[in-house]
């Protein structure tokens, strides 16, 4: 995929509108996790250093076109300027007189954060008039928010039609990593898909079995597939009504020559709680009054062996109830094996999605993967093979 980056842009003394992701977690008016802010520093710092007037566009929360103090981006100014190590100006609107006055006052290298774009209904509607009102304050447009790229909103997609458009460094890193993961990967490719429910990942599974060489199914989802094969999963989380869908996916995988790897043994418990009494059983002998809470040792060995044969790995979703010890065992063991192979230079590893990031952090290996996407919805839609409007408009 070819797209325009900051290397293609002349930004000296230009007003550069930069779409960033500042939808950060807050508690009592304080930002509790700086990850998303840290990701956008390279783009902002580079533009400022090159003498651009840097104007940041972002949304926060879901205000549905109504301004409110709790959804104001003013709360982000302090942590942003601290992480940037650069003063950040703030405008109380993203369009109109207040925005224009703040932009007009900028000197080369200055950084300005405009108020929440979603305080205007035109943002989510991608309203042409709102797009023009935003564009009035910029000469160039840079999108550095892959996490919002699956939405065709004014600040994520509309602006790229009216201003010269470029990918920021965080966007560029994400797109290059994803290209290695599924776009044009080194083979064989193994995908790990876990999490609770098959119903939320049907599009994902259908896309992956056409693109990968082996698909590991774990977490609560695996129970639905085991049940579809006629096995008794006891009181485990299971979508019995999707048994025929699971069988269709397995049949399709045979025709696309994608090996499906399901657990062969399981750690079962009698209560959904940490440190509940537990025991390992083969998946063909799970007690009727127990529930599967993690994959067993034979299963993790099977997954590790598939990873040893792979050149590329894409991961979305944990292999068990990782938030409850000891049912984090399979997720941690496999994650550490992936990290080891990656560090040895034998594997390209891409992981993403909320629970996945939390699980890899829990295993202490998030920094050892080739790339971890914090994008959530956009990462999933990319894995599902769906078009991403905010990315498509950046292509050369």
UniProtKB/Swiss-Prot annotation:
Origin superkingdom: Bacteria
Localization of this protein: Cytoplasm
Annotated positions binding ATP: 201, 323, 353-356
Pfam families: PGK (PF00162)
Involved pathway(s): Carbohydrate degradation; glycolysis; pyruvate from D-glyceraldehyde 3-phosphate: step 2/5
Key words of the record: ATP-binding, Cytoplasm, Glycolysis, Kinase, Nucleotide-binding, Transferase
Enzyme Commission identifier(s): 2.7.2.3
GO cellular component: cytosol
InterPro entries reported for this sequence: Phosphoglycerate_kinase, Phosphoglycerate_kinase_CS, Phosphoglycerate_kinase_N, Phosphoglycerate_kinase_sf
Catalytic activity: (2R)-3-phosphoglycerate + ATP = (2R)-3-phospho-glyceroyl phosphate + ADP
Enzyme class: transferase
Binding annotation for substrate: 21-23, 36, 59-62, 118, 151
A single BP term in Gene Ontology: glycolytic process
GO terms of molecular function: ADP binding; ATP binding; phosphoglycerate kinase activity
Similarity remark: Belongs to the phosphoglycerate kinase family.
Subunit structure: Monomer.
Protein name as it appears in the record: Phosphoglycerate kinase
Origin organism lineage: Bacteria, Pseudomonadati, Pseudomonadota, Alphaproteobacteria, Hyphomicrobiales
Gene this protein is translated from: pgk
